[in-house]
Amino acid sequence: MVICKTGHVAALKACYYFGIEVRIVGYNKNYEMDVKEMKSKIDSDTICVYTSYPNYPYGTIDPIDQIAPYCSKKNIPVHVNMCLGGFLVPFLKSETTEKGFNFPKGVTSVSLDPHKYGLSAKGASVSLFSD
């Protein structure tokens, strides 16, 4: 699995439990996944690219509009972690969030935590998968 340094530690923990190789990518000057470096980490053994919308350390959104189309061409699933901002960021008005919310082809799953901003019970979580 390819993941940015800013990705949530729970993804790393899951990879450890399931014996999945992790390839960590750096971030650019805006604290978003470095797409060029991400491309260099992908090979035939890559099972997923893990992105954040937004990430926990900085609150920035990975460039999903660049990542998903590239991965789609290579038949690599893209997961978007929206646990922190899934019930908040889509409703903010800015060029970045409006552009990033309409996920391009290639995004195969998202995760959301309604307990953060969705007024749900603590520990509630949602995973959505494309068909």
What are these regions (language model features)?
Residues 1-131:
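Conserved PLP-enzyme active-site core in the AAT-like
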